[in-house]
Structures are given as C-alpha cells and as structure tokens.
C-alpha cells in the first residue's frame, strides 16, 4: 500500500513490510494469551484476558505494558461482532472500529471491518478472509482485492484449545501492524466462540 494506512497510530507503520510472529498459549479452555513479536524476536505486544469481565474483553498491551487497544465482544454475540477501542477505555468516543462476521451461515468466518466514522456500515473499510484452523487468512483494503496482510501457520484442533500455536503474519509496508494484530486476535476469538457454541448445541441436542 502506497499511502500510509494508519488506524491505531503512525508509529505502527513501517516503510518496509513487517513480519510478525504470534504465539497463542492456551491457559484454559475458554481463554488464552497471545505474544506478538517482530520477525527477529523483539516483543511488540501481549494480549491479556481480564478476569471476571462481563464482556469478552481482550487488552492489547505494548512491550512496556501500556494499553494500546481494548477489544470487546458482547457475550451473546462474541461469535459475530467485536468493537475495538483506543487504550483501556470502552467509551463511545474511544471507538476506533467494529469487526463483524459478514454472514452467520459461513463455515469459515469472513469478517468485515468498519471504522468508527462509517456509521451506516454499508461498505466495509477492510475485510478478512480465511480461518485460523485453515492455516491461512488474508486482510484486504476495503471491499477490494488489494492485500495488505496475510497470515500463515500450522494449527491443530488440539492446539486450538489445549496447546500452543505459532504462526506468522506479513504486513504490507505503510500498514498499521497494531491494527492487523488486533484483527488476527479477533478472528481467533470469533472462531473459538463459534466452535464452543456449536459443540454446546450438539451436546444439548444429544441429551
């Protein structure tokens, strides 16, 4: 991308492509922690799950522990809609963007991203295609075929819930990599919530 794509902050944009290494270590069946580093191992972000939150909330911290973003999904809609706020606030004025599943009948989530000023949400500002468990996902600018980031890795169902997953993300030059990191985290959370809902429904029907 030629023009800088600044969503979270200009300091997260580089004139060269940025490689991110992401590790997700599962602590419990319902939550996990992410560690995000540069390709050469420098710590960039951590993602923490606050205890006893009334919403599905995740906090993106920088290497110093400062709050960069708050990711919030309502408990009844965590499988299809999340809001992302600047810093540690969840006030309306701190809203940066909303991420939602474009269709509830999709086997693999296709996500649409709407910036805070896109209140009508008719045309998305970004979109994400692919799935964590499919080992690949791609982030596009707007409703176009322009790729601004892509993820690859090797996940297993066991690792998804009980182990440790490693994967890499390549972010295009001039693209906000804090923004991209948050989209990958939300993609995983949406997949996880949808899978748990599906399994719970099957168990109830089975009984």
Swiss-Prot record:
Q: Tell me which stretches of the chain form a coiled coil.
A: none
Q: State the similarity comment.
A: Belongs to the LOR family.
Q: What is the lineage of its organism?
A: Eukaryota, Viridiplantae, Streptophyta, Embryophyta, Tracheophyta
Q: Which GO terms describe its cellular component?
A: mitochondrion
Q: Tell me which tissues or organs this protein is expressed in.
A: Limited to discrete pathogen infection sites in leaves.
Q: What does this protein do?
A: Involved in basal defense against virulent oomycetes. Might be related to the phospholipid scramblase and tubby-like superfamily of membrane tethered transcription factors.
| Summary of the knockout phenotype | No visible phenotype. Reduced basal and R-protein-mediated disease resistances.
Q: Please state what the protein is called.
A: Protein LURP1
SUPFAM superfamilies, alphabetically? Tubby C-terminal domain-like (SSF54518)
* Gene Ontology BP, a term: response to salicylic acid
Kindly give the PANTHER family that the UniProt entry links to this protein. PROTEIN LURP-ONE-RELATED 1-RELATED, PTHR31087
Task: Check the record and name the Gene3D superfamilies matching this protein.
Answer: LURP1-related
Task: Give induction info.
Answer: Up-regulated upon infection by oomycetes, but not by bacterial or fungal pathogens.
* InterPro entries the record matches: LOR (IPR007612), LOR_sf (IPR038595), Tubby-like_C (IPR025659)
